[in-house]
Regions:
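Conserved pre-motif I regulatory segment
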Residues: 1-23
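Conserved helicase ATPase core of P-loop NTP-dependent helicases/translocases
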Residues: 65-69, 255-259, 264-306, 325
């Protein structure tokens, strides 16, 4: 369906259901659609002298301003009683009453938060927004509240020309096997090994923790397994920093967003980084959207709820095992009319497995594998 068809479908369904979930790909325009639905309800239910109460839930404090900007951008909401609150503070609204509740990025509704939500008396409508809702949460709202779910994933959005199809450049790399500079501990001794040797060593440790967990169901082993796997992906990202700096230099005249593995890596790869640690993050984002700067780097803060203007290139220095995070990150780039995604990755590693999952929804014609950054053409 086109954007207009989904918009009309949602408007036609909102009068017949109290709970609606808009499961739409990042970049689709969920906030605008939610604002239109709110105003439709206001026109249908409330008289001129009445003012509906609206609660909008967001995942982070920075997203409160994003919603204020969106409301202003799309002509306002027909109410003076609008509360924008973070999910962390939802418990403060237990047993409260609102005419309309909007749950932005509703994947943040944990079981405990859903319990609080169930105590809120919603007079007219609950509207959930997400590109990445989990199946069990979707099923809960369908079975408990007969929720109407309207979906549009990445593949459908591209096929129906709701979003542009990006050109995806894959840049396969090989771990070095000749230079001995990496230290690992084996049999209680420090051993100097190669890049490939270090990767194999940490992978063996991950498998050991994993097997220990499945044999014992010891939660400590599970935590060690998952945390070490995360450290492995972070290490892989760090090995690509020199390459990414070359990419940023090559595309210095194009608006580029680089996804990093940590705040520290965001700082190393970009002067204008957007992180929870950087007090200038909001200013950097504004300058980027106003085209005053070309490059920004980020780790997690740009995964959701933040709008980017005309970003042409997305560089995935860090690969994430979370399908939710991957979809959110790709959505940051698909607002440009001809987006480019560049994914450098190490062959025969966990990264290669993640890349294969990432590109499943793209057509084969849009994926180009290159041997050198010089082969990437815009």
């Amino acid at each position: 369906m086109t954007r207009e068809e989904i918009h009309d479908l949602a408007l036609s369904k909102i009068d017949m259901t109290k709970y609606m979930i808009l499961e739409l790909i990042t970049g689709f325009g969920k906030s605008k659609l939610a604002i239109d639905l709110i105003n439709h309800i206001c026109d249908r239910v409330f008289r001129n002298n009445e003012c509906p109460t609206i609660l909008i839930l967001v995942s982070k404090t920075v997203h409160k301003q994003t919603w204020k900007d969106e409301i202003k951008k799309w002509g306002g909401i027909k109410s003076n009683h609008i509360t924008i609150e973070c999910y962390e503070s939802l418990k403060n609204y237990e047993n409260s009453c609102f005419d309309i509740v909007v749950a932005d990025e509703m994947q943040h509704l944990s079981e405990a938060r859903i319990d609080v939500l169930e105590t809120i008396h919603i007079n007219e409508s609950f509207i959930g927004l997400s590109a990445t809702i989990k199946r069990d949460m979707r099923d809960y709202f369908i079975h408990s509240h007969k929720a109407e779910v309207i979906k549009c994933g990445l593949k459908e959005a591209v096929e129906d020309e709701v979003l542009p199809e990006p050109t995806v450049y894959l840049l396969p790399l090989t771990l070095d096997t000749t230079i001995y500079t990496y230290k690992v501990k084996k049999f209680g001794r420090d051993i100097i090994t190669t890049q490939k040797g270090y990767y194999d060593s940490i992978s063996s440790l991950i498998e050991w923790y994993k097997n220990k967990y499945f044999n014992s169901r010891n939660e400590r082993m599970k935590n060690l397994w998952l945390s070490t796997a995360g450290k492995r992906l972070k290490w892989c990202a760090e090995q690509k920093e020199a390459l990414v700096l070359h990419l940023l230099d090559k595309f210095r005249n194009y608006k580029t967003l680089t996804f990093c593995s940590s705040i520290e890596q965001s700082e190393r790869l970009g002067k204008y980084n957007i992180t929870s640690k950087n007090k200038a993050s909001v200013k950097n984002l504004e300058m980027f959207n106003l085209n005053k700067i070309k490059h920004i780097t980020a780790c997690n803060i740009l995964n959701e709820g933040v709008n980017l203007t005309n970003c042409r290139i997305g560089i995935f220095c860090n690969l994430n095992s979370s399908e939710i995070v991957v979809k959110q990150r790709v959505g940051r780039i698909l607002r440009h009319k001809s987006p480019i995604i560049i994914i450098p990755y190490f062959k025969d590693t966990r990264e290669e497995e993640l890349v294969q999952k990432m590109i499943e929804e793209y057509s084969k014609d849009s994926i180009i594998s290159v041997d050198s950054i010089n082969d990437i053409k815009l």
